[in-house]
Amino acid sequence: MKIAVTKFLGTNCDLDVCHAVKLAGGEPELVFFTQENLDSYKGAVIPGGFSYGDYLRAGAISARTPIIKGLKKMVEEGKPVLGICNGAQIGLEAGFSKGTLTNNLNAKFICKWVYIRVENNKTPFTQYYKKGEVLKIPIAHAEGRFYADDETLDYMYKNNMIVFKYCDETGEVTEEANPNGSIDNIAGVCNENQNCVLLMPHPERASEKILGSDDGLKMFKGMIDYAKRI
Amino acid sequence: MYKATVIIKLKKGVLNPEGRTIQRALNFLGFNNVKEVQTYKMIDIIMEGENEEKVKEEVEEMCKKLLANPVIHDYEIKVEKIE
C-alpha cells in the first residue's frame, strides 16, 4: 500500500506525515516535486511546511511544479489525496477544490490546539468519524483564512464540500472558536468527488496520545483502508 | 525591451488584514484622520516582445496562470518600452 508523500523545497512536515501513515498501516514514500508520474501510488499526502518561503502566495509556486500533474490525475481517478496546511494551500492553488486560503484576520502566525467538527464523514479520510464528532488537533499557519464568494460557498455546501469547521470543545461553531477569520469557521474542504480533502489543521501532529491527542490518526487509517479497496 | 508592471490588489469586499493593521498603527501614532489603508503587490517584469500590445497579452496570461489568484485578486498591467 504505497502512499506518496510529496516533498517541495521548504516542505517540513513530511517525516511526521510518513510516521502517521506508517502508524495507520500504510507504506509512505517521499516523492520529490520534479516527479510527474505517480501511477504506482494508491494515494498521496501533501504535507505542510513553507514551500518556496510562501513567496507570491502560500502554495502558489508549488502548485505549478511537475508533480501537480500526477496529483491532479490521482484526484481525477478517485484516489485519496490529502493536503495538510501548506499542502491544503497548494491543493487549492492547483484547483483541487474551490475557494482559497489567505492571510489570517489578525495578521499573525497562529500555532495552537483547536477543536474542529466533522461536517462530512463521507470522505475516505473522515469515514471513521461520526458526523458532528469533535476532534482536538493543532494548527500552525499564517495564511489559513478560508475565503470563497457567496456563490462558490453555496455550491460547496450543495455538493458536500465542507469537511471540517472550527468549533469549541462542545462542538459549538462560534466566532470565538474561529482562530483565523475563516468564512463560516471552515477548516477543511474537499472536491465534488469527496476523494481529495484539504485542511489547515495538522492531523499528523495529533496521531499519538503522547502528542496530546490521537484524534487525527483515523484520517490516515480511513485513507489507507479506502486505498486498499480501489 | 519592455518593462511590464503588474499591480495586484484584493477584490472589493475581501478583507486586507495587513492594511487594517497598518491603519491601526497610523491611528496609534496620532494620524486619526486615516480611515482605510490598502496594500498592493507590485511586480516588474523585464522582457522581450514584439510590441506593447503583445507584451500586455502575455503578461495577462502570466497573471491568470500564476501571478494573481482569481478568487481574491484584481490586477492592472502597465507596459513601457525601455532601452
UniProtKB/Swiss-Prot annotation, chain A:
> What are the GO BP annotations of this UniProt entry?
'de novo' IMP biosynthetic process
Catalysed reaction equations from the record: N(2)-formyl-N(1)-(5-phospho-beta-D-ribosyl)glycinamide + L-glutamine + ATP + H2O = 2-formamido-N(1)-(5-O-phospho-beta-D-ribosyl)acetamidine + L-glutamate + ADP + phosphate + H(+); L-glutamine + H2O = L-glutamate + NH4(+)
Q: Does this UniProt record's set of keywords contain ATP-binding?
A: yes
- Which Gene Ontology cellular component terms are annotated? cytoplasm
Entry EC no(s): 6.3.5.3, 3.5.1.2
Q: Which GO terms describe its molecular function?
A: ATP binding; glutaminase activity; phosphoribosylformylglycinamidine synthase activity
Glutamine amidotransferase type-1 domain location is 2-230
Pfam assignment, any one? GATase_5
> Which keywords, in A-to-Z order, does the entry hold?
ATP-binding, Cytoplasm, Glutamine amidotransferase, Hydrolase, Ligase, Nucleotide-binding, Purine biosynthesis
- Grouped into one coarse class, the protein's main location is cytoplasm
**What is the top-level taxon of the source organism?**
Archaea
PROSITE patterns given for it?
GATASE_TYPE_1
User: What is annotated as the active site?
Assistant: 85, 202, 204
Q: Which CDD domains match?
A: GATase1_FGAR_AT
Pathway(s) of this molecule? Purine metabolism; IMP biosynthesis via de novo pathway; 5-amino-1-(5-phospho-D-ribosyl)imidazole from N(2)-formyl-N(1)-(5-phospho-D-ribosyl)glycinamide: step 1/2
Where located?
A: Cytoplasm
User: What is the protein's quaternary organization?
Assistant: Part of the FGAM synthase complex composed of 1 PurL, 1 PurQ and 2 PurS subunits.
Q: What does this protein do?
A: Part of the phosphoribosylformylglycinamidine synthase complex involved in the purines biosynthetic pathway. Catalyzes the ATP-dependent conversion of formylglycinamide ribonucleotide (FGAR) and glutamine to yield formylglycinamidine ribonucleotide (FGAM) and glutamate. The FGAM synthase complex is composed of three subunits. PurQ produces an ammonia molecule by converting glutamine to glutamate. PurL transfers the ammonia molecule to FGAR to form FGAM in an ATP-dependent manner.
State the PANTHER family in the record: PHOSPHORIBOSYLFORMYLGLYCINAMIDINE SYNTHASE SUBUNIT PURQ
What protein name does the entry list? Phosphoribosylformylglycinamidine synthase subunit PurQ
Q: From what organism does this protein derive?
A: Methanocaldococcus jannaschii (strain ATCC 43067 / DSM 2661 / JAL-1 / JCM 10045 / NBRC 100440)
Swiss-Prot record, chain B:
Q: In which pathway does it act?
A: Purine metabolism; IMP biosynthesis via de novo pathway; 5-amino-1-(5-phospho-D-ribosyl)imidazole from N(2)-formyl-N(1)-(5-phospho-D-ribosyl)glycinamide: step 1/2
Q: Which InterPro entries match?
A: PurS, PurS-like_sf
Could you name the Gene Ontology cellular component terms for this entry? cytoplasm
Subcellular location(s) of the protein: Cytoplasm
GO terms, molecular function = ATP binding; phosphoribosylformylglycinamidine synthase activity
Q: One Pfam family from the UniProt entry?
A: PurS
Job of this protein? Part of the phosphoribosylformylglycinamidine synthase complex involved in the purines biosynthetic pathway. Catalyzes the ATP-dependent conversion of formylglycinamide ribonucleotide (FGAR) and glutamine to yield formylglycinamidine ribonucleotide (FGAM) and glutamate. The FGAM synthase complex is composed of three subunits. PurQ produces an ammonia molecule by converting glutamine to glutamate. PurL transfers the ammonia molecule to FGAR to form FGAM in an ATP-dependent manner.
Name the UniProt record assigns to this protein: Phosphoribosylformylglycinamidine synthase subunit PurS
Gene encoding the protein: purS
